[in-house]
Amino acid sequence: VKPLTEADIRSSFVNATPDELAQLPIPGLHEMLWGDREFLGWRDPQAARRGYIVSWIDDRAVGIVVRSAGGSLRPGIAAMCSFCHSPQPATQVRLFSAARAGESGRNGNTIGTYICEDLGCSMLIRTAPPHLNPPATIAMRGEALLQRVQNFTADIMKTA
């Protein structure tokens, strides 16, 4: 992902309330390995169910606020993240919902999908043994991940 500044992040959110923006925690941007990320995703340390996802769409940073469901999937079964398509224990995948942008979202309309609980999909697609993930495979998985994140974000931005 192209590096993001705090100003990029704060101005990017399409479905955040003024209160959410005022309380928005910014992750340690100086620690980011931008070349190893397709999007920036993080959880709010003060609001355990809240998370944030920022990606670039057509040279514009677009951010969405997501909320995890209160419960989790049943332990002992496998689940798959709809972003990175990585199968993993069900306890590591969570249903997240996001309010639609604009009046539609203010009226309570949301969209949900299953995502890695820590929003660390960019790292997960890179954590297989090297012989199973040559650079070309990682690039292909990264492009597919970014496309799915952008599609979900575009759905959030639809107001009808």
Model-derived segments and spans:
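Short linker/helix segments within small regulatory modules
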Residues: S97-T113
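Cysteine-rich micro-motifs
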Residues: T113-G120
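Short cysteine-rich clusters marking metal-coordination/redox-active sites
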Residues: C81-H85, C116
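Polybasic, low-complexity binding patches
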Residues: R126-T159
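Short Cys/His-rich Zn2+-coordinating modules
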Residues: W56-G70, F96-G102
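Short, flexible, mixed-charge glycine/proline-rich loop motifs
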Residues: V66-I77, R106-T110
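Charge-rich, low-complexity N-terminal segments
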Residues: V1-V62
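Short functional micro-motifs and their immediate structural scaffolds
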Residues: S86-A90, C121, R126, P130
